[in-house]
Amino acid sequence: MARFRGPVGKVSRRLGIGITEKGQRILNKRPDPPGQHGAAARRRALSDYGAQLREKQKAKFIYGVLERQFRRLFEQAARRSGVTGEYLLSLLERRLDNVVYRLGFATTRAQARQLVNHGHIVVDGRKTNIPSYTVKVGQVIAVRPQSRSRTYFKNLVDSGVLNKHRAPEWLRLNPAELSGTVVALPRREDAEAGINEQLIVEFYSR
């Protein structure tokens, strides 16, 4: 299955949540679902299954995860003791591409995924080009030393934008070193807002 590269505005309007900043801007201007009967579709109540499916799709699109990967993450979360939905969100937050995004090294998760794919990111000093890699507490995520001389990363440092960036509390950002440390597991409130994880659990528990 190919990764989604379609119009984020349409998807954001269909799901009722901005899956990117651009998607949120479009949603603010045009909140109705796309299509001729968008306003009517917005008023029509979803079935239980429809609501569960929509929540799963929201999380998939926001975090940029394919269906097979998403199911695997859910199964991993379900095997753990505790609240399955919250642990699922923790796994999504701890994906390497999401961490690169949360640290401010990229402006979107798609860009963060590209940086990882192209070998610009190291974990504990080792090049890691797998966006789905799950980071652990204590690990250090950084821009590869050989990549720091590239214009993009030099601008990140020279512009001071990282000094103003607010990383979540579970990550400690070192702007000068283009690195960040995982200091804790992400909490429920650290995950992307607008996702009802319990509906996702219900979807896979049918």
From Swiss-Prot:
It comes from the Bacteria. Part of the 30S ribosomal subunit. Contacts protein S5. The interaction surface between S4 and S5 is involved in control of translational fidelity. Residues 94-157 form the S4 RNA-binding domain. Belongs to the universal ribosomal protein uS4 family. GO terms for molecular function: rRNA binding; structural constituent of ribosome. One of the primary rRNA binding proteins, it binds directly to 16S rRNA where it nucleates assembly of the body of the 30S subunit. With S5 and S12 plays an important role in translational accuracy. GO terms for cellular component: small ribosomal subunit. InterPro entries: Ribosomal_uS4 (IPR022801), Ribosomal_uS4_bac-type (IPR005709), Ribosomal_uS4_CS (IPR018079), Ribosomal_uS4_N (IPR001912), S4_RNA-bd (IPR002942), S4_RNA-bd_sf (IPR036986). GO terms for biological process: ribosomal small subunit biogenesis; translation. This is Small ribosomal subunit protein uS4. SUPFAM superfamilies: Alpha-L RNA-binding motif. Keywords: Ribonucleoprotein, Ribosomal protein, RNA-binding, rRNA-binding.
